[in-house]
Amino acid sequence: MKSVLCRNLGCIAIIAVLFSGCSSEKKLSQISGKVSFKGKPVPAGYVTFTPDVGKGTNGQVVGFQIKDGNYDSIRNTPPGIAPGSYKLSIAGFDGVVIPFFGQGKQIFNPINNECVVPEGVSTKDIEVPNSAGENVKIEKTADT
């Protein structure tokens, strides 16, 4: 009887060890920051993080809403972003809601940037270059 109990406990221990490292969930990092254009906070918009596969980052594209010049990964579901290298796309709007333009009028052409998201908590502030505001092309959005 004692040997059967020991054998069963041994099997349970081995199974527990085998499955302890099998979680497919990666630990998510937190990132936040300010987005400004011509020295002022961008009223509305979004920052899109696309994994840079060429630099070894895999995963989903993640977008964060800009509100009053700030974005924060904690507002998303799940809250956070996997650590790694990303290509960024930033779009900004004036925040004045009008028909066909849910976030308002576009205030600069979308810009691209790069970012490395470290493990843990980090900040990435973005200053949109003034040149992005020249010859603004109105891009259709999901709201149009």
Each model region followed by its residue ranges:
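Glycine/proline-rich low-complexity segments that form flexible loops, beta-turns, and polyproline
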Residues: 2-144
